[in-house]
Structures are given as C-alpha cells and as structure tokens.
Amino acid sequence: MSTITSHSNPKVKQARALRQRKQRAASGLFLVEGLFHIGEALAAHAAIDSIFYAPDLIDSDFARQLIGRAQAEGITCYETTAEVFESLAEKDNPQGVIAVVRQRRVTLADLTSQYFPWGVALVAPQDPGNVGAILRTIDAVGASGLILLDSSVDPYHPTAVRASLGSIFWYPIVSASFSEWAQWAKPQGYYIYGTSSKGSVDYKEISAYEQPLFVLLGSEREGLSPEQAAVCDQLIRLPMRGHASSLNLAVAAGVVLYAVLERLE
C-alpha cells in the first residue's frame, strides 16, 4: 500500500471528520490518539477499524510493535507523511499513530444484575473529562460500568477518551433517559445510593452496601432533583468542612466508589 501524501485523501478526510460529534454519531466511529491508549484498545480486542501512522514521527519500538500487531491481526494500516498525519492529530508533538475505533453499542437490555452487580449512573454530566475520569475510577475499583442519564456529553469525545486512560475499551457505557433507567433498575433489584448534600447518612457511616447497586450522582451544577432523589433507596452525603460547597464530580465519584469497594471487600 502506497504512502498517503494528500490531505484530501478520502480516508484521511473521513478520519479527520471524526473530530466532530455529528460524524462520530453518524458513523459509530471515534479517534484514539496516543500509544498507551491504542495499546489498550488492542489488548481489549476493541473493534479497530483502521490505523494511520507516519514513520517519520515514530521514535519508539512500542509504536512499531503496535503497528506490527495490528497488521498481524488484519487491521488496515495506512502509512502517511508526517504532514498528513499532523492534520489528523489533535495533540502537539504527536506520537505517529492514530486508530479509528468502532464505538461499543450497549443498551440497558444487554445488562443483568448478575453480570453488572455494581455501577455508576450520572445524571446529565456536562464535562467529557469528568466522564472519562469516572470511567477510569470504575476500572480501578473493579465496578461494572457506567450509565449516562439524560446526557448531552459524548463519551467518545477526545477529552473523555484521554481521561479514561484506556478504560473506555474495557467497560460498558450505556446512554438512557433517567425514567427508562429507573424503570429498568428497580425490577432488576438494584439498590440505589444517591449522593446529595441533603443525604441523611455520611458515606463513611454505611457499614455495608447492598448488591446489586448503583451509585447515582447528579449533574455538576444541579445535583439530584427531588424527583431523582425520590428514586434512591438511600441518600448519602460527603462532609464539607471548609468553604467549598461541593466536590468536582469525578472526585466525588472516586470518594464514594472507594468507600463501596472497602465495604464490599
């Protein structure tokens, strides 16, 4: 296969278009940049559509090994010039390899409490970085996955992908409406712990967590509405001792998830 030298090459244009959410949604594909992330995609047997690489930008054996492994697995690999590759890359000083990966489509109907015993549900998150960081924490504590409720954020936004540090390839992400999720979770027997400044119990005071369970966190700005809080079996609070009135969403999720892990172990 000859080296791609033109910025207007159809394959390059299609890949570049994936910077836009509209194109990611229409195609079901997203871009993955960074050697570690691409290595995780390969390790997780993610559905990699293709790889673009620029030999002039590659300066590590690991990068060359990734390309060799991808080729051995039958993944189409396009060699490009450095200039063409840089038109694809978002990061400064790119490492010379970008993957086009197919999004993993998972719905609530695909999940059962047996194989999804404890997860996180986020109501209307706004920041893709928070979504990626929470997914990374889900991975770290060995939880089951992430549900995005009434969400406008794209979990395949480059910021979310980077913040997940590869966890996006290992754990399911489901998008649903709040009402759809609540109507599904209750019959499945999930115990729902909601985080709220009005919670009746400090998170540290819970001696045991019921399973299967969800940790439900409200939006960065509004928290849980009264209607959303009413769905919870228990509202828990994180103490605020100083002037801050709340924690960053990803930080709050991390605090609660590690508390759950400690009790479950």
PLM segments and residue spans:
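Structured adenosyl-cofactor binding patch, chiefly the S-adenosyl-L-methionine
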Residues: 99, 137-141, 155-166, 226-265
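Amphipathic alpha-helical repeat scaffolds
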Residues: 34, 127-134, 247-252
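Short, acidic/turn-prone active-site loops that include or flank metal/cofactor-
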Residues: 56-58, 83, 151-153, 220-222, ...
